[in-house]
Amino acid sequence: MKDIAALQRDYARLLIREGLNIQKGQRLVINCPVDCAPFARLCADEAYAVGCREVIMKWRDDYLARIKYLYAEDSVFDEVNQWEVLLADTVSEEGAAWLAIHADDPENLKGVDPDRIRRSQIVSGKALEKFRQREMRDEFPWCVASIPTEAWAKAVFPELDADAAMERLWVEILKACRVDGGDAVANWRTHSDELQKHVKMLNDYNFKSLHYTNSIGTDLTVELPEGHFWAGGSETSAAGIEFSANIPTEEIFTLPKRDGVNGTIVASKPLCHNGNIIDGFRFTLKDGKITEVHAKQGEDILRDACTVDEGASFFGEVALVPYDSPISNSGILFYNTLFDENASCHFAFGEAYPCITGSESMSEEELKARGVNFSMTHVDFMVGTADLSIVGITHDGKEIPVFVNGSFAF
C-alpha cells in the first residue's frame, strides 16, 4: 500500500488528468485556501507535467474572510474587486481550466451579520455573471475537489485530536475519490462509465415528470422540460475537452422545468452555506416558486439564500444519487456540499445547468421559454433517505419506478 504522500500525488494527478484533462498550451487557475498550499503545488506540478502553459493561483483565507465581514467598512460589501472580474472573464473566455479546492471551515462565518453576506453575494453574483454563465454551459473545463483542513476535519470528527482528524478525513476523501493505491485515473474512468449506464436509461425513458415521497414528509412533483437530458460522470467543454466537474461524484442530474415543481420537499441532511449551518429545513413550492421556508437552525440564513434574486426562489437542478453509495455508506456527515450531495439525492435552488438539447445555440430568452431558471446563486441541498420513492411519469401517463427504498429500481 502506498503511503499518504504518494496517494496525495495520485489524487493531484487524477484532478489534473481526469478532472480537468489539461491540454498542452492551456492555462490553469487554481482557487485554493492558503492552508492547502502544499496540495495546490502538487496540482501545479502535475499540470506542468502534461504541458500546461501557466498555473495561476487564486488564494483565499478563512480567517481573513471572517475578519473582513466583522470589521471592514460597511460600504465594502456593496463593491467588488474589478481584478477578480477581469481574471474570471479573461481566463474563461480563452477556455482556461479552473480547479476549485473547497476546504472551508463549515462555521467560519457563524455570528457574522447575514446582511453583509447577502449584499456581498449579490454584488459578486452580478459582477461575475458572465463567468458563471460560461461555467454552467461548460464553455471551459472546471473541477471542484476538496482536501482536509484542520478546522474542517475537527468539525467532521470532533472526538479526535487535530492530527487524527486530519488523517481520518484524508482517508475518507481518498476512498470516495477511488484513490486506493492502484491506477486512480483508470478507477475513475470505470466509475464514470457505470454512471453513464444510468444516464442512458433515464434519457431513454424521457420522463415528463418525477414524483418524490418518503416518510419524513416529502411529497413533491417535478416536471421536466421538453428536450431535457440527464448527465453524469464526465462532461465535454465547448472545445471538445472531456472533463469531470466534481471529484468525487455519484450523481446523475438534469434540470426541472422552472414553473413545474409543486409540493413539499424536506431536507435529509444539514446544509453548510456561507460559513453557517442550516438544519431541519423544508420548502413548499407552488408553480415552481418557493412559497414557504422552515428551518430549525439557520432559517434567516436560508431565507436570505433563496431570495438573493428572483431566480433563487426556483429550483435549478434535480440530481439522483443512490442511498446505497460509498459516501452514504460511510455514515459520515462531511459538512461539505461536494461530499454530502454525493451521499444523497438532492436539488439545488437557483441557477440551472442548461441540460436542454441544443442549448448552446439558444439565447437566454429562448432558454427561459423552455423552462430554464436563471439566478446568481446555485445552492445544493440533500433530500435522499433510505425509504425515498421516486416514480417517473412518461408522456403517455405510465408510471415507472425510478427509486425504490432510496436506490435505483433499474
Question: For each predicted feature, which ranges?
Answer:
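Dual-mode signal for accessory low-complexity, basic/Gly-rich regions
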Residues: 292-361
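Short conserved micro-motifs at the rims of enzyme active sites and ligand-binding pockets
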Residues: 111, 155-157, 277, 305, ...
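Short polybasic amphipathic segments
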Residues: 209-212, 281-284, 291, 386-394
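Active-site bordering "gate/hinge" segments
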Residues: 1-262, 398, 408-410
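Long, well-ordered mid-to-C-terminal structural blocks that present hydrophobic/aromatic surfaces
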Residues: 252-310
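Short linear motifs in exposed loops
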Residues: 223, 293-294, 403
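A structural signal for short secondary-structure junctions
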Residues: 258-259, 274-277, 284-285, 309-313, ...
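Extended hydrophobic packing segments that form well-structured cores
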Residues: 366-410
